[in-house]
Amino acid sequence: MSVESFTPTAIQFSQGAASKVKSLVDEEGNPRLKLRVFVTGGGCSGFQYGFTFDEDVADDDTVIEREGVSLVVDPMSYQYLAGAEVDYQEGLEGSRFVIKNPNATTTCGCGQSFSI
């Protein structure tokens, strides 16, 4: 029997998203804040993305650092986000964090809901 080590596909934390997180953290004046990205059931397509700021990191969380700020993902959400990119976009419909997820087979027009 052979045993292979499993290396999860990294989640990308874009330059634009990191810059926006840094700006928001600086604005709050709390350098302990991290952007937590998570997946929950719901939305038009079955799952939806969520974003919140959090000071805490659990032992089993994945932490991705860029520009001195951190993106945190819990293990359940990571399985749906492996290979995805967390970005920040500004456009006519407003400014927001977005996830470009190659695992999603369908996405809602709002960009916050998806199915696998």
Curated annotation (Swiss-Prot):
GO terms for cellular component: cytosol
Details of cofactor binding: Binds 1 iron-sulfur cluster per subunit.
PROSITE patterns on file: HESB (PS01152)
Example GO molecular function: 2 iron, 2 sulfur cluster binding
Cofactor(s) required, per the database record: iron-sulfur cluster
GO terms, biological process: iron-sulfur cluster assembly
Binding of iron-sulfur cluster, residues: 44, 108, 110
InterPro entries found in the cross-reference section: FeS_biogenesis, FeS_cluster_insertion, FeS_cluster_insertion_CS, FeS_cluster_insertion_RrpA, HesB-like_dom_sf
A Pfam short name: Fe-S_biosyn
UniProt entry keywords in alphabetical sequence: Iron, Iron-sulfur, Metal-binding
Methyltransferase recorded as keyword: no
Binding partners and assembly: Homodimer.
PANTHER family: IRON-SULFUR CLUSTER ASSEMBLY 2 HOMOLOG, MITOCHONDRIAL (PTHR43011:SF1)
NCBIfam families associated with the record: iron-sulfur cluster assembly accessory protein, PRK13623.1
Similarity comment text for this entry: Belongs to the HesB/IscA family.
Function according to Swiss-Prot or TrEMBL: Required for insertion of 4Fe-4S clusters for at least IspG.
This protein's name: Iron-sulfur cluster insertion protein ErpA
